[in-house]
Design a protein with these regions (language model features):
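Structural signature of alpha-solenoid helical repeat scaffolds
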Residues: 41, 59, 78, 96, ...
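Amphipathic alpha-helical scaffolding segments comprising HEAT/armadillo-like alpha-solenoid repeats
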Residues: 25-37, 61-74, 98-111
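Structural signature of alpha-helical solenoid repeat scaffolds
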Residues: 18, 54-55, 91-92
Length: 124
């Protein structure tokens, strides 16, 4: 999947991400493309990309050093779904390599008291 601005509609991108989710053989080579989707204006695409990056980071943590800070930036989102997905993604990456998320470790605990239940559950 090669993402280029305005090349795909939201539904096409979501469908592509769904197909990519099932094709783990190409995950490692697709990390950069999925990361690029974090810059879209679509909440749905950003959320799916964050989720998939978490899964990819669990499998390929060695490829995630340059992406973790951008994922962590979503922890400050006003959108609960993006906070939830970022928290989940960091948790997945951290399970594979704690050192990657160590700079954010203390900040993660504030989400135990988040106003949104889904965010609190992702903290666990």
């Amino acid at each position: 999947m090669k993402y280029k601005n305005n090349e795909y509609s939201e539904s096409e991108l979501y469908k592509e991400l769904g197909a990519l989710t099932k094709n783990k053989d190409v995950w490692e080579e697709s990390i950069r493309d999925v990361y690029a989707l974090l810059k879209t204006d679509s909440l749905k695409i950003q959320a799916k990309a964050l989720w998939l990056l978490g899964e990819m980071g669990l499998k390929y943590p060695q490829d995630f050093n340059e992406y973790v800070s951008s994922i962590a930036d979503f922890l400050g989102s006003e959108e609960p779904l993006l906070r939830e997905r970022a928290l989940n993604a960091l948790g997945r990456v951290g399970r594979a390599d704690f050192e990657l998320i160590k700079p954010y470790w203390n900040k993660l605990f504030i989400f135990a008291d988040d106003s949104e239940p889904e965010v609190r559950l992702s903290f666990i």
